[in-house]
Amino acid sequence: MLESFSDLSALGGVTFERDPYADFHALQAESYCGTLISDTNGGGTINAERSFLTGFAYPHSRYRRDTWSYVRYFAAQGYSTQGGHPGYEWFYDRRSVNENLGFSRYDFMENHYEALPVGGSDYHGRPDDAAFFADRRADYLARDPSQSYFSFSVTYQGHSPYSDTALEGGVYCAHDGLSDGAYCMINNYLSSVADTGRQLRAYVDSFREDEAPVVLVFFGDHKPTLGTGNCYYAELGVNVNENSDEGCRNLYSVPYLIWANDAARRVLGDRFTGQGETISPGFLMAELFDRCGWDGPAWMQLQRDTRRRIPVIHRQELFVVDGKWESELQPDARPLYDELRIAEYYVREKLQRREQGSS
């Protein structure tokens, strides 16, 4: 999962002097890719993170006890389960929650990344994407090759704040039509995005010739906040008014892509290319399983049934149904949503209740 990664070129009217998305778009051209509608803007990273790992919709529980997740599902299929995030384990209570979601090992600043050399640049004391992706590659190479490998990691580069008083990287948007603050902040954000794209491409390249089948999933957690009240989006000519369909899509849309090396394409019988649906983060794991040709657990079957009609379930009970934003579901769609939430409660509580009963 890529911190604050979004494709501003997908928003109508935004033009660049240099393309900050050249490497990312090259990856999209050889991947299965689509759009997520995130629950948040500029923060709340764990909403997308935990939705992907569980399939659960907003609002989330606090995960204070062992809870069912796709991490546990992979572990039950014989996978090792690990990951990393160059942030502190106490933030969002990630250490405890990740243990409760079933990760056997997770690297944080305290137990791993504080000792990692970061080379020429860092981000608030954290490793940059070059160091982070190299570390995740090293973790993969150190795996037990006799065991299948599931790794979920979260980047830090791209995290706000972005300076609005000085340029800290390259120039991608011209100054014409932008205030000084917008010019600096937007270009600083795009400089980070461009570097993330370069690091993604290098990371993907490192798996191309791997004899083991490898499938990689990348997605943004949310769009960045650009200026007070997102005022700098307006200077770009982008509508982010939440009272309109266009504004909601612009404000909450982030990209996802699913890439597979040749070995995985042969084994799974899929090219892993083409255009995917616009969905909520909670449906992304099901999208991955569909590409892999895997059935998944019963919970995922219900997710698929719901996704066909309601592909986006947004916080505060906003939905996308038949391509349109709705604040109130139609009578024929409401039972699908209600059934999903009831099943979600059961799936979430089942493991906790089982453990309570055995104690």
Where are these regions (language model features)?
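Solvent-exposed soluble domains appended to multi-pass membrane proteins
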Residues: 1-359
